[in-house]
Amino acid sequence: MKHLFIRILLVAGTLSACTPGNRPVFDDMPGMVSYTYRDSFSKDVAATLDTLQAMGIKDMEFSNLFGTTAAEIRQLLDERDMFCSSFGVGYTDLVNKTQEVAANAKTLGAKYVRVAWIPHEAPFDLSDAEKAVADFNRAGKILKEEHDLTFCYHNHGYEFYPHGEGTLFDYMMEQTDPAYVSFEIDILWTFFPGQDPAALIRKYPDRFKLMHLKDLKKGVEGNMSGGTPKENDVVLGTGQLDLPAILKAAKASGIEHYYIEDESPVYYQQVPKSIAYLQGLSE
């Protein structure tokens, strides 16, 4: 009954939000970051995948193996006609366990390996960026040339301190090798430090391959710390971000996979509403 209600909600949202004759922004259901359902995955991977499958989710970005193995998760995905397109790992594992990371990514069936945090003492500075660039170029080359995997760095807000005529994020874009390093744009962690996600995508249309879909509670002021209370994640379309403008820019770029990420403790209430919002968007 719960799953039936969710499906009815999604259909109702789609019918009410779409304008007849307009093309939906998403032909296929956007994916999901496992971090959204981290508490549930930690208790029961199979049951959590069942929940996501019932909502129409097929595309997964796993940021953790949750006490299982890559092979076990792959089997559970295959049994549900789901797939993992991106595998998120920690910075240290990327650098020191590159081959193990690659093996797990290949077993999962992922095309991308992603890192979402650069260890640093705040504030993030040029020396941090320089080290990350060197590590990303080196690991990215191994992943691409030896395993046909694409490395992506996921921005987290602290990279936008001024540098030269731009920011440290611009520096990282300029100094990383496009053949080996791509990027995943987290739109909340682009907006939070004062940047325009749509403008950033237009500036680097070929470097972004993945996107985290998030929204920030109205009234919350940002900074460059890379952190905000999890309660500030809200249902897509109800916060501060201009989702239609961002997605318009994204659709004209090289972004291939979109993942819903909701860090809120009430994600299970918010995610169905976010899905309905996305399905109701039209071009």
Where in this protein do the model-derived segments appear?
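Sec-dependent signal peptide recognition
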Residues: 2-11
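Histidine-acidic metal/acid-base catalytic patches
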Residues: 3, 21-34, 40-55, 166-169, ...
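N-terminal pre-domain/capping segments
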Residues: 18-112, 282-283
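Acidic-and-aromatic substrate-binding clefts and catalytic sites of carbohydrate-active enzymes
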Residues: 37-43, 59-71, 89-97, 120-124, ...
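Active-site acidic/histidine proton-transfer and metal-coordination neighborhood
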Residues: 50, 58-59, 91-182, 268
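Conserved beta-strand positions in the central sheet of alpha/beta enzyme cores
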Residues: 61, 86-88, 114, 152, ...
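A short helix->loop->beta-strand "cap" motif at the edges of active sites that frequently abuts
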Residues: 82, 110-111, 147-149, 252-256
